[in-house]
Amino acid sequence: MKNWITKQTANVKSDILSGLTVALALVPEAVAFAFVAGVDPLVGLYAAFMIGLITSIFGGRPGMISGATGALAVVMVSLVAKGNAMGAPGENLGLYFLFATVILMGIIQMLAGLFKLGKFVRLIPHPVMMGFVNGLAIVIFLSQVGMFKENIKDAFGNNKIETHSTEQAMYIQDAKVYDSNTNVFLFAKSNSDLINPVNQAVIYQIEGNQVFDATSKEVKFNIEDNEIFNVEKTGISKQFLPRNELLLMLGLVLLTMGIMFGFSKYLKQAPEALIAILVVSGIAIFANLDVATVGSFIKDGGGEGLKGGLPSFQFELFSKIPFNWETIKFILPYSLILAAIGLIESLMTLNLVDELTETRGNSNRECLAQGGANIITGLFGGMGGCAMIGQS
């Protein structure tokens, strides 16, 4: 027992500092991946907290970090959007479908561990491993380009929404708006306003090639050559920061990288990444530099900031989602894809850490830990996750 305690506490200082570094690095990533998936930032933070904690205790590879990841988030976008479309506006049904999908994803991953399928990762050729690592590096680099951009505002001061035209809904002829299917007269057009002909109330306003609800200022349609189309929202319009702000941000990025790589041999007592984060954050705060923060990033994305408590059991999941064959048919394909991506990324990361440390992890145990973590995360309101090669 004494030897076990001695072994576990031999590097306690390095472990604490490394854990602090990873925690600070995970916050903005979890927030960003939550926005990618189309859910609240806290859903991403809950996933980072629960996945990371559970896999670190029960996983099969010491030194491997898990949390919300971009590879899973890009698959979740479609799931959340389709789920929301199945419910009433504002019901947020897509979020609950996401939780159910993550639970089923975890069950599939645990089955992979029980049937000892994790060992097959050893059969992956080395060139494939290198391609995986370099591909992820490119994806991570490209994902950072968005940090050098700012949201474009529309005519009403809100974030400008990018839209894609779908089917035609209405058309304009002789200053009158008609339904495209029935040719019924709907609105009168006066300048940029679409007016209810009965009570003369302004219902919609035209700004550029978009039609906005006059009350909520939310984009509802696209307009092209007197034809009005329904829309599919694809994101928030962005542009690169103004020159001075862009140069300031680039300077801080280069300073951070310089501390991490240029002074690594002088920073033996603490992780270089932690020192870089603390030093550059201190400069930005005490010099009162006008730069984006995690909080402002959340608000720019439509959130309200980092406000919330610990994750709680999602009792609403069982009343919101009908657990029948139709639900299974909807979430099963997403669960299979997410489970496969999560296990492949986790086991390839495990294999890479094995090579770096010249030790051997337990791939089947990692499958069980990843699956169990995702089940608990889904039940407690997280978006699920897997191993993160960058942090590991």
Write out the residue ranges for each language-model feature.
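Transmembrane helical cores of multi-pass ion-transport proteins
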Residues: 1-185, 189-201, 207-392
